[in-house]
């Protein structure tokens, strides 16, 4: 999955009895939890990818395939129009959405947080409004997935300043719809077992069946499903929080960790420390990525945190100190190495829009948070943005 594109099979059975069924259940669960909702009196703005014909086959982002294949029933509740939703160029798509949807009764958003934030900023630029409630006063829901939402929450709350706004997490990957947040009082998701997916889990080299998982353990996810995948490792890791019913929380990617110096830093550690540092310094982080800085004859090793701020901290030094302190508190291996082979992290701040522009140029939808070498970090640092978004 490190290539520019990965090709996986998509069958009509998986589109209807996995992905579409998952979306319908999201609507049902949201309605059950919010009986006074009026979200269905308007439309859900869905920011999809693009697709095209390769021979007789339709190939593209799953979101675009879903929009293309389900238009006849979901078109009543979704914006923008199909031909706009699957425009390949992001700038052109945003401009078209602004023209088409500003006057629409939008009550919900759905999609990946980072791309939706970029669209929301474009809408505010287009309309000259201060926040999205001045554009769409009936907004009440954002169904999000694809990445950890916590780093984006503050930005969304500033753009949509309403206590009535609800955020619902879904685990809807290209390979299948796997879980959703069914209980607003909890921070985990219910694993959906009747969507045509057979789950197995890997712990080290051991393959564990669903009935053998343990709470508190992190597992890599393997699926055999109705889209033709057979014992396929999707690249995600999850932690079980309950086994009756089965509940999970997203723990990161199997390849996203840093262990160059024996520090065993994982995404969960990084997210926890970053949020704590933001709370202590008033910062809001848009995007970040971490890479190792290798040891030399004269210098110890370190981690370089490349950070794009939505709102900068009151002091970068205090932010760096807080980040380091929290990492040491949550990861004993990191703390031990900080006393020997590791210096405090190096903080590199980049201009707003750098990460999004890099993703667009590389055809990626997500920023790799932790990378065990410097390939991604050096690309991002060398990348020149054409504009600040």
Regions found by a protein language model. Give the residues of each.
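Conserved adenylation A10 loop of the ANL superfamily
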Residues: 1-8
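Conserved substrate/cofactor phosphate-moiety recognition/catalytic segment
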Residues: 8-22
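Short, solvent-exposed loop/turn and secondary-structure capping segments
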Residues: 8-10, 57, 121
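A general alpha-helical scaffold signature found inside nucleotide-binding enzyme cores
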Residues: 18-21, 25, 265, 269
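Conserved ATP-dependent adenylate/AMP-binding module captured primarily in the ANL superfamily
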Residues: 20-35, 95-104
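Conserved AMP-binding loop of ANL adenylate-forming enzymes
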Residues: 24-73
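Active-site glycine/GP-rich loop and adjacent strand/helix microenvironment
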Residues: 63-389
């Amino acid at each position: 999955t490190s290539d520019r594109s990965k090709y996986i099979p998509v069958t009509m059975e998986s589109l209807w009895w996995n992905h579409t069924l998952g979306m319908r259940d999201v609507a049902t669960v949201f309605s059950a939890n919010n009986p006074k909702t009026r979200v269905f009196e308007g439309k859900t703005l869905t920011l999809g990818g693009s697709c095209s014909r390769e021979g007789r086959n339709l190939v593209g982002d799953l979101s675009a395939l879903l929009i293309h294949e389900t238009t006849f029933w979901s078109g009543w509740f979704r914006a923008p129009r199909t031909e706009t939703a699957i425009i390949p160029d992001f700038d052109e798509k945003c401009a078209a959405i602004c023209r088409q949807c500003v006057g629409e009764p939008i009550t919900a958003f759905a999609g990946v947080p980072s791309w939706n934030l970029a669209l929301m900023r474009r809408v505010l630029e287009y309309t000259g409004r201060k926040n999205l409630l001045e554009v769409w006063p009936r907004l009440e829901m954002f169904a999000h997935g694809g990445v950890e939402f916590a780093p984006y929450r503050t930005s969304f709350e500033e753009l949509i300043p309403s206590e009535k706004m609800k955020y619902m997490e879904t685990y809807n990957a290209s390979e299948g719809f796997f879980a959703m947040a069914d209980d607003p009082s909890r921070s985990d998701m219910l694993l959906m077992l009747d969507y045509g997916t057979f789950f197995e889990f890997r712990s080290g080299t051991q393959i564990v069946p669903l009935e053998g998982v343990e709470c508190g353990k992190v597992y890599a996810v393997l699926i055999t499903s109705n889209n033709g995948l057979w014992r396929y490792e999707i690249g995600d890791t999850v932690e079980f929080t309950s086994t009756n019913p089965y509940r999970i929380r997203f723990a990161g990617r199997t390849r996203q960790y840093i262990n160059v110096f024996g520090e065993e830093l994982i995404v969960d550690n990084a997210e926890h420390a970053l949020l704590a540092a933001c709370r202590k310094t008033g910062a809001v982080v848009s995007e970040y990525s971490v890479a190792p800085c290798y040891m030399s004859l004269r210098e110890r090793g370190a981690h370089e945190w490349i950070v794009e701020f939505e709102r900068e901290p009151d002091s970068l030094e205090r932010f760096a100190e807080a980040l380091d302190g929290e990492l040491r508190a949550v990861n004993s291996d990191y703390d031990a190495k900080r006393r020997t082979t590791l210096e405090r992290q190096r903080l590199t701040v980049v201009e707003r829009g750098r990460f999004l522009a890099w993703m667009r140029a590389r055809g990626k939808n997500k920023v790799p948070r932790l990378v065990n070498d410097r390939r991604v970090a050096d690309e991002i640092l060398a990348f020149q943005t054409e504009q600040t978004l």
